[in-house]
Amino acid sequence: MIIMLSEYLEEFKEYLERFKNIDINFSDVLKMSKKFIIWRLKQIFGDSSTIFTNISSEITIFDKIFQMIDYDIDGEVEKRLPKDESRFMIGVRREKEIEIKKEIITNLLDFLLIILLSHTPYFNAFVRKYAEIKKIKVIKKLPNKISVWEFIKIASRSRINDLHLERLDLENGFVDITKIKEIFAKEIIRVELMKLGENIKKRKLPDDSVVKELLNEISDYLKDKVKYEQISGIKALNYKGNIPLEWHPPCIRGILNDILSGGSPSHYARRSFVVYWFCAKFNPNLRPLDKNGNLVNVSATDIASEEEIERFIDELIEMLFKNVEDFDEKKTRYYIMHNIGYKVGHGRLTHCEYCKNWQDDGGKGLSYYCKPDELCKKKFIIHPLDYLCYNINKHLKKERFKKIKKEDKNGDNK
């Protein structure tokens, strides 16, 4: 039996309990650790080698922080010191104590970053980076063979092709993960962090200046680093302006989050996403069947110019698919062109599936992403693009109403 969460994630669970009533001490902790949070963010994204400059005074600051959240850091350090540590000289012991404290402090900073970033468009990018830098720690804990049930706990929440059980050796209830240990380690971190982020996202951040300042500073730093942030801002026919991510259905958002955080959705899920995204951008009213029930056969050039299509493909590859674990640019380009019916293959757009086919997908890997919300349950939402169109129309209606009210107020509508 192995522990699926590494030690730092266990730390996060403890911090989660300590910050349950987030308004009590969260802002004060942020205020005291603000510069360290930004330093740690820069370290994770490769722009800083350390978060500590004057360790003695900095540990004093964090001793106060741990006291605020009722965390016995000295007791924790004592537990982590080797049992025979008393044999060493005082100087050596002190050095080891400082190293342990630095690790505990870094865990706290990571947790604070997760809280903040889960309320921004950059959380997926953070998860991908974090899984990459922490994988070694997890790999060291992983044996070559693990219980099939422990394997399934992670594999069932991952869409990485290499984690399909039929591809691996299974003997006496144990899976041999020797060849895929690095991938498995990253997925342990990724799926658990995504789950943690989702839970934290449900809690509102305190509405105060220190939170706003930190979020602005994080955004200013990451907006140029994370090129695909604008992936959530596509434009649609008859609608001027960017479409917010929440206007897209949960299934599409789920696939997007998986890709951006370094996951690898199934072939069918990627195909549905690509075609949905293309139609959302150029013709969100397009559906697989016309009103007479006939299949709608169109190619990409029927709804967009070649220049627009080429730009769409380039952006999708650069902003999105480069994050996928099994990325191959040449294959990905061909695959996108084939799915939207552009220059290769049968020359017809392969439509995004109707909702009923997501729910009963016959093993295509679509049902995993089908998590209906209240809007999905409305009778007229039978296709993912219906969800988008509903939100576009709702917004346009609201804008028209605002305009009429303004004209009435100014006396221009007589």
Curated annotation (Swiss-Prot):
GO terms for biological process: DNA replication, synthesis of primer. It comes from the Archaea. Pfam families: DNA_primase_lrg. Keywords: 4Fe-4S, DNA replication, Iron, Iron-sulfur, Metal-binding, Primosome. Its cofactor is [4Fe-4S] cluster. Coiled coil: none annotated. One of its GO terms (cellular component) is primosome complex. One of its GO terms (molecular function) is 4 iron, 4 sulfur cluster binding. Transmembrane segments: none annotated. [4Fe-4S] cluster binds at residues 251, 352, 370, 376. Binds 1 [4Fe-4S] cluster. Belongs to the eukaryotic-type primase large subunit family. Regulatory subunit of DNA primase, an RNA polymerase that catalyzes the synthesis of short RNA molecules used as primers for DNA polymerase during DNA replication. Stabilizes and modulates the activity of the small subunit, increasing the rate of DNA synthesis, and conferring RNA synthesis capability. The DNA polymerase activity may enable DNA primase to also catalyze primer extension after primer synthesis. May also play a role in DNA repair. Heterodimer of a small subunit (PriS) and a large subunit (PriL). This is DNA primase large subunit PriL.
